[in-house]
Every structure is written in structure tokens, then in C-alpha cells.
Amino acid sequence: MKRTSVFLMVVLALMLTTSIAFASPATQATIVTRLSGAEEVPPRDTDAQGIVLLKPSSDGTSLDYRLIVAKIENVTAAHIHCGPAGENGPVGVTLYHGGLPGSGPVDGVLSAGTATAPDAGNACGWETIQDVLDAMATGNTYVNVHTNDGVAPTNTGPGDFPGGEIRGQIQ
């Protein structure tokens, strides 16, 4: 319980800091999405959780992001996928890549940056960040954090869900 309270306080502090950092009269509101194993398809039994902050530019050409996670291990990747709630879809924008299987626990900011284009050749059909923003506006996008402990078989429990351990529908 104490660890969850500390996590929530850290998230709130980061949200305030991020809001200040992203603030400018010409930009749009920050989108906040909570990530959990319950949102995965199929649902995952995990204590891992996360939050992603997304801030589109006023001209629709870029998307600032900050992905914060807690109680998660062996993160290998995180993406924005296209797809409605309750369905899995392809990767459209990479938020984090390069974590090695079996890399251990992560608590805090997993990744932060600015996306200026979706992944080249993505199966969502997105060619520009505006395409991503349009899909977000219709509820057809989600953030997924993938894990892998590097030991066969896969999907054996927390820290070993290559298809995704925590997810949140962007709304």
C-alpha cells in the first residue's frame, strides 16, 4: 500500500512538472492515460501499472510523450497501437525500444520524447502524426508496454508478456 501511495505521489509530481514543461499558449491539452494489466487482451494478472502523458502540438505535426511505469520488469518495448478497446492491433508509433529480455525492474520514467512521424510502413496506415491524432480522437489507439524475461516459454507471468503486460486506451 505504501509503495502504491509513493508511486501515485511521484506520478502526480511528474504530471505537474510535465504540465508546466509542456505549457504554452499555442498547444493543446495533455492527454493522460492509465495503463494496467486489466486492459490487456487477454487481461494480465500483474501488479504493474503505468501512466502516459501525450501532448500534441498545436499544428498537429508532433506529439510529446512521457511514459511512467511502476512494478514492472523486463520491459522490451512500448508503442502506440491502432485498435479499439478490447481488440489487439498493430504498432503505429514506437515510444520505447531496446530493452533486453530479462533486463530487470523498472520504476519511473521509461521514456520521454517527441514523435514527429509514425513508424515507417506501419500497418495502421498512418503517414503523419496528424493521422495518429485523428485515430486518437476516435478512441482507436492504445499504449502497450511489452515485457519478456528471455526464458521459454513466454506468457508465464509478470515480466514475461511479449504481447503486452500493461495497456491503456487513449481517450
Predicted regions and their residues:
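Low-complexity intrinsically disordered segments
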Residues: 1, 14-15
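Bacterial N-terminal signal peptides that target proteins for export
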Residues: 1-8
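Cleavable N-terminal signal peptides
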Residues: 10-11, 21
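Metal-centered catalytic cores of metalloenzymes
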Residues: 16, 20-78, 82-171
